[in-house]
Amino acid sequence: MNLIWGFLILILVLIFLGVFFSFVPLGLWISALAAGVSIRITDLIGMRLRRVPPGVIINSLIKAHKAGLSEVTLDKLEAHYLAGGNVDKVVNALIAAQRAGIPLTFEKAAAIDLAGRDVLEAVQMSVNPKVIETPVVAAVAKDGIELKAKARVTVRANIERLVGGAGEATIIARVGEGIVTTIGSAESYKEVLENPDSISKTVLAKGLDAGTAFEIVSIDIADVDVGNNVGARLKMDQAEADMRIAQAQAESRRALAIAREQEMKALTQEMRARLIEAEKEVPLAIAEALRSGKIGVLDYYTLKNIIADTAMREAISKLGQKEEEGRKD
């Protein structure tokens, strides 16, 4: 009977130890004590209950302790992890900042990490500036010649402006705008080709890093190429447009002239019809004059001779015009 009770107690002890060691990573606790980090067993159990991986927190705390970061505590690391932050990266960034002599607190590093920035990369960029290449920027000088420029922008991360500061895209856009402004204000494209550093000096003096997460160290023009003669092309396009406008105006005047000609022809036909209608009244008037004795028979024949003579002259005149037109043809 005692043997059975002893066996049951052994089983219960083994179950208790299994549950205990599942909650308490004993090896991690020993490692922390060996590194001089004071950790209570209850802290490890609490992390398990809060579903916080003790390995991530304890190892980061050991690194911070060995680096002399006294401000980093267990509660801060656990709170940052529960907020969705990257504890290991924050501690590595603090160590790198301390070695480089960059003032960076845990709260600032945690805020940068929670803002979605890579805090470790930001610290490294503060020590080793990063080079950003802009795409080819095309601009036109005052003489109408297009220039295509490409720049290299050396930037250093500004730790104080990482939260809420604009990113690389803003730097590239502002540098491109500065290049366009500088080339556009040049009297001749030759001025830019002779002094390409004038672009970088002008752009750098504009303070383009205001409101961004970076500090511009230098702007270097990598390449400047001559593009199209935009001014000449615009003049050609303008001349072609003017020619089309003139052609349209000429066509409009021609249409008006044709319409006027047709109108005059219609008016001529109308006048001719009135003339014929009036000529129909002449014989009646002559007959009435003969009947009333206003003219005599001799006067009548004299009038007929005049009419015949006029008709003959008109016929001869028309014949002469036809012969002259035939010679011209």
Curated annotation (Swiss-Prot):
Pfam families membership: FloA
Function field: Found in functional membrane microdomains (FMM) that may be equivalent to eukaryotic membrane rafts. FMMs are highly dynamic and increase in number as cells age. Flotillins are thought to be important factors in membrane fluidity.
Main location group: membrane
Location(s), subcellular: Cell membrane; Membrane raft
Gene: floA
Organism: Dictyoglomus turgidum (strain DSM 6724 / Z-1310)
GO cellular component: membrane raft; plasma membrane
Topology class, membrane: Single-pass membrane protein
Keyword Calcium annotated: no
Similarity section: Belongs to the flotillin-like FloA family.
Subunit structure: Homooligomerizes.
Membrane-spanning segments: 4-24
Signal peptide: none
Protein name: Flotillin-like protein FloA
InterPro entries reported in the protein's UniProt record: FloA
Keywords for the protein's UniProt record, in alphabetical order: Cell membrane, Membrane, Transmembrane, Transmembrane helix
